[in-house]
């Protein structure tokens, strides 16, 4: 796990340095580039060819943050919806995650992993950064639970620019989570989301989001 974290930290630093993105990218651009990212990996993964949909921004994204949800796929309308109020670097990964649902991958860990693959193989450093950073957060959260000293070693590897992005996101969620609205809505929303996932065949419910780590480890050591 530590070795994977080192790799993801180094890749996050490199992608951040390579990225020319300084201002928030319009979601219409992110959506188009996400489709390009999927198209690029279709030769390697032909099963990802069968979808004509695209991701859409949630108009009330700030309100959606009070539910703790950053994206949702609605099977009844075949729509992928993304919360665009959160830190900008999340948008490519979250968009690709919802597109993975459009391609028929309903399990959250699988959608996360497909989003990771689409992002890190993109020609756009902004997308690669989003993929590596999201994976890094999953991996370091697990590492923190196992060994806080090793976690701090990984933190020390991150560039000032990467730390700045993480700090920005922490501030955003801290403001959201300290409100009474969040404490009330998020609890109910979490139960609804958990039930929704279980109804759709994911017996682990919201816990399935974190299972991406098993796939990340398998992919890393298969290199």
PLM feature spans:
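Internal, well-ordered alpha/beta segment that forms a basic, Gly-enriched binding/recognition surface
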Residues: 1-16
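Alpha-helical scaffold segments in carbohydrate-active enzymes
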Residues: 7, 36, 40-44, 117, ...
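Pan-zinc metallopeptidase signature
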Residues: 163-223
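Generic structural signal for hydrophobic core residues of well-folded globular domains
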Residues: 86, 99, 103, 118, ...
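Soluble non-cytosolic domains of exported or imported proteins
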Residues: 28-32, 85-90, 102-109, 126-130, ...
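Active-site recognition of the HExxH zinc-binding catalytic motif
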Residues: 93-112, 116-117
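Auxiliary, metal-adjacent structural segments of Zn-dependent hydrolase domains
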Residues: 12-84, 88
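Active-site/pore-lining binding-face segments in mid-to-C-terminal subdomains
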Residues: 113-165
């Amino acid at each position: 796990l530590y070795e994977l974290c080192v790799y993801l930290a180094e890749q996050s630093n490199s992608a951040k340095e390579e990225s020319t993105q300084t201002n928030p990218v319009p979601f219409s651009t992110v959506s188009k580039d996400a489709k390009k990212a999927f198209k690029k990996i279709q030769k390697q993964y032909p099963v990802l060819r069968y979808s004509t949909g695209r991701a859409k921004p949630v108009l009330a994204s700030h309100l959606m943050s009070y539910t703790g949800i950053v994206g949702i796929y609605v099977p009844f309308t075949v729509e992928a919806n993304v919360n665009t109020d959160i830190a900008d670097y999340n948008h490519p990964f979250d968009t690709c995650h919802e597109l993975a649902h459009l391609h028929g991958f309903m399990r959250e860990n699988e959608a996360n992993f497909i989003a990771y693959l689409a992002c890190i193989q993109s020609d756009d450093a902004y997308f690669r950064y989003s993929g590596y950073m999201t994976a890094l957060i999953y991996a370091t959260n697990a590492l923190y639970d196992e060994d806080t000293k090793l976690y701090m070693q990984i933190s020390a590897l991150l560039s000032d620019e990467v730390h700045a992005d993480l700090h920005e996101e922490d501030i955003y969620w801290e403001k959201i989570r300290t409100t009474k609205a969040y404490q009330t809505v998020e609890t109910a929303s979490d139960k609804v989301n958990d039930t929704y996932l279980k109804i759709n065949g994911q017996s682990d419910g919201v816990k399935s989001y974190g299972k991406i780590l098993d796939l990340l480890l398998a992919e890393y050591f298969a290199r």
